[in-house]
């Protein structure tokens, strides 16, 4: 009977061990991951969906302006001296309007942004500060004409002198609020035929930085008013219900799967997320690059994996922008399709390291870079006497991603807007200025998740830790049970095969007594 029970115990222990191995190697992890992934996919009843539709916290939108302190010297050919003023901090609120759902696990939406000035975070800076900056809109108009029809540049400049009030040189004295959102008034009143053509061109193309002035024959120029309280899109994005590892990928923008202005499928590809949501990361297949689609520059940008880092006591993957993202075609031949002739009359259109031509995207000869030309060509710095100093800590773009949920714990995007200052002999405002790339301002857009969400993530990671402990505990118990049952079976078999005779030792009664005949 003892042997039979031991064998049953051994069999049950083996089954228990097999179950423990299956659960430990596959089952527990899959059950927990499935529950976590159910919460991160964009299903209407998931936590992530609610937070994705309306961000639970505002983003920090910071603007740093390059104030020109030696205008007269620059007008005479001297190197610019710049003074960085900022940050002017705004709270950026984001909300999405759902338009519908696609057949391929996609969701269509419009994105609305709203900006509010944050005086506390801005410190002593106010929107009434008056600064001197490069005259972006004037130079954009003049350079466009100079590149396309140089013979008309003097005629158009006369019209621009009427369009822009108090146009003395290539610099603008302006209040911060007017430069950013309220707008600088451009008057189309006048009898100059060239002015009529210029205003007609603006009216027909209406660049993002221009808007029609209500009740008058003119326009307002501002850098960001087109972003405020207006919707962009529609975007079409994968929800991650069918495959959570595709969550957040943008598949189309404004109904297009490729940005046509670059004339090339590689440069025009729309891939990656909108930077607000990423898919979970497989620990055995960590992506070397992550992509985000940036409609403001009409392209996708990638960041490279650096390493694994801890943030807020949470293990994350840290990515930062690669120097090849804005590399010259000599360093990254794939970027050759971003080359467009506009930078100067005898330039092939392929810009220096660290620059991106925005003319095809914005309709104006703007050039993007990282702040202070970080990761750009050293040649760009030679143009300035002082005030431009790239610094990785201040000017890098990066993101920390939780691999379990894909949630961004902290991230910052930074971008600088520049325009060419070009010497044109027959234009009074430009006849003596040094030719070079002139920065106007740079932006920092980022956020760090609040403590409440940090705690949720820590709890998720703790749960995985508990599962790991439970896995090994279950395996240990199963192995001990198998060993114990195996020993019991072995001992039972030994008992059954033990020799039974008169000289044997009884484990119950003790040794038998043998009678000895001593004789007479």
From Swiss-Prot:
It is found in: Cell membrane. It is a multi-pass membrane protein. The chain crosses the membrane at residues 8-28, 469-489. Glycans are attached at residues 44, 67, 104, 228, 271, 313, 342. Its main location: membrane. The keyword Nucleus does not apply. One of its GO terms (biological process) is sensory perception of smell. Keywords: Cell membrane, Disulfide bond, Glycoprotein, Membrane, Olfaction, Receptor, Sensory transduction, Transmembrane, Transmembrane helix. Residues 1-7, 490-520 are cytoplasmic. Coiled coil: none annotated. Residues 29-468 are extracellular. One of its GO terms (cellular component) is plasma membrane. Localizes to cells surrounding the sensory neurons in the antenna. Associate in a ratio of 2:1 with the neurons expressing the other subtype SNMP1. Pfam families: CD36. GO terms for molecular function: scavenger receptor activity. Disulfide bonds join 267-337, 298-361, 339-350. Plays an olfactory role that is not restricted to pheromone sensitivity. May play a role in the elimination of lipophilic components from the sensillum lymph. Belongs to the CD36 family. This is Sensory neuron membrane protein 2. It comes from Heliothis virescens (Tobacco budworm moth). The gene is snmp2.
